[in-house]
């Protein structure tokens, strides 16, 4: 697994150097080497999964496994550009494979049609990063805990109508490098004034700074104790999307599916009831998530998939290349407002 900045023994061929020339210029040869040595598991090949797959394949990871056991329907391919229009009834991963591989023949792209729930623990240990979409809360928590023991990076994400999120767990000690402007020492001449003696930033030179940051588990991030004074004082700045995520994950757990447009009336009432129950359990008022949320959280929307998939793909690339500061640990996107926010949640 790629777990330290020093591990850079992947060889980049001349053909690969030409293919990834722009990226090498952008984030450096060492970062591209780490990407080319990384294998990623992507679970869920709907609209969001397709966006993430595209971004990882174009970035140039070594291998990408597309895992999805469900069959293509007209509804499931509306936001999914990797699946042909005549693929109804086929498996999502298999139907996406040809177009995904065409994006970059240098990446090993595979399809896995088995349910992720049936996979043994050691299945996940062959990857450097695991990205989970359209998965239950229990499964995401299980995989996150498994991967933490092997320093495997875990990402989760979903799109619900106008809203979407991503979560990342990069471990207790995640190391990365960040490019900073170089600071030039001031003058030491006795006759120079105070301004000349002050250190200055040279805009033409940069230096690479090594940094370390810690992440909490998904379980800890979802189990914040909102009854504490510290948590209560922060409620005003907490995005409602965090509580929307809790409601939608509970809906998925209870119903085994996401809210469906063809059962809008029934699912809307159930969402409101789950909202009341979830927030009451947290010791919070249902006013934190107004009733109008039910009008905007059905199905995947292509533009929202593009935004969230772009951010999620970018964060996976950053984590594998160990270049630049990562989002810690949630990113929420609100399509109605056209805005995204990064926030950190932990029960500790």
Curated annotation (Swiss-Prot):
GO cellular component terms listed in the entry, alphabetical order: cytoplasm; SUMO activating enzyme complex
Cell compartment(s), UniProt: Nucleus
Pfam families hit by this protein: ThiF
Assembly with partners or alone: Heterodimer of sae1 and uba2/sae2. The heterodimer corresponds to the two domains that are encoded on a single polypeptide chain in ubiquitin-activating enzyme E1. Interacts with ube2i.
Function description: The heterodimer acts as an E1 ligase for sumo1, sumo2, and sumo3. It mediates ATP-dependent activation of sumo proteins followed by formation of a thioester bond between a sumo protein and a conserved active site cysteine residue on uba2/sae2.
The family this protein is said to belong to: Belongs to the ubiquitin-activating E1 family.
Protein name, UniProt field: SUMO-activating enzyme subunit 1
Gene source species: Danio rerio (Zebrafish)
């Amino acid at each position: 697994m790629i777990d330290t900045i020093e591990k850079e023994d992947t060889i980049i061929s001349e053909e690969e150097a030409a293919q990834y020339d722009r990226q090498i210029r952008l984030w450096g040869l060492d970062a591209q080497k780490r990407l080319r040595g990384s294998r990623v598991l992507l679970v869920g090949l709907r609209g969001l999964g397709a966006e993430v797959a595209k971004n990882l394949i174009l970035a140039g990871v070594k291998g990408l496994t597309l895992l999805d056991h469900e069959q293509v329907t007209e509804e499931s391919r509306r936001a999914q550009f990797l699946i042909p229009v005549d693929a109804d009834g086929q498996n999502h991963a298999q139907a996406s494979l040809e177009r995904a591989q065409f994006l970059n023949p240098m990446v090993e792209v595979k399809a896995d049609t088995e349910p992720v729930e049936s996979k043994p623990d050691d299945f996940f240990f062959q990857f450097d990063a695991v990205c989970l979409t359209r998965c239950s809360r229990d499964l995401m928590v299980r995989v996150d805990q498994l991967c933490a023991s092997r320093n495997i990076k875990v990402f989760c994400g979903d799109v619900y109508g106008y809203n979407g999120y991503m979560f990342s767990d990069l471990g207790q000690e995640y190391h990365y490098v960040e490019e900073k402007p170089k600071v030039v020492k001031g003058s030491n001449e006795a006759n120079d004034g105070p301004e000349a003696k002050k250190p200055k930033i040279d805009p033409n030179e940069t230096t690479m700074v090594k940094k370390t940051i810690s992440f909490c588990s998904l379980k800890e991030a979802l189990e914040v104790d909102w009854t504490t004074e510290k948590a209560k004082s922060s409620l005003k700045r907490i995005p409602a999307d965090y509580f929307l995520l809790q409601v939608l994950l509970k809906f998925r757990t209870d119903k085994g599916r996401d809210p469906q447009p063809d059962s809008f009336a029934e699912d809307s009432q159930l969402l409101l009831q789950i909202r009341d129950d979830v927030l009451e359990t947290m010791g919070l008022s249902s006013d934190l998530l107004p009733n109008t949320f039910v009008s905007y959280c059905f199905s995947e929307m292509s533009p929202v998939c593009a935004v969230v998939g772009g951010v999620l793909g970018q964060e996976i690339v950053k984590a594998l290349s160990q270049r630049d500061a990562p989002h810690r640990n949630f990113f929420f996107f609100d399509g109605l407002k056209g805005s995204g926010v990064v926030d950190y949640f932990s029960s500790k």
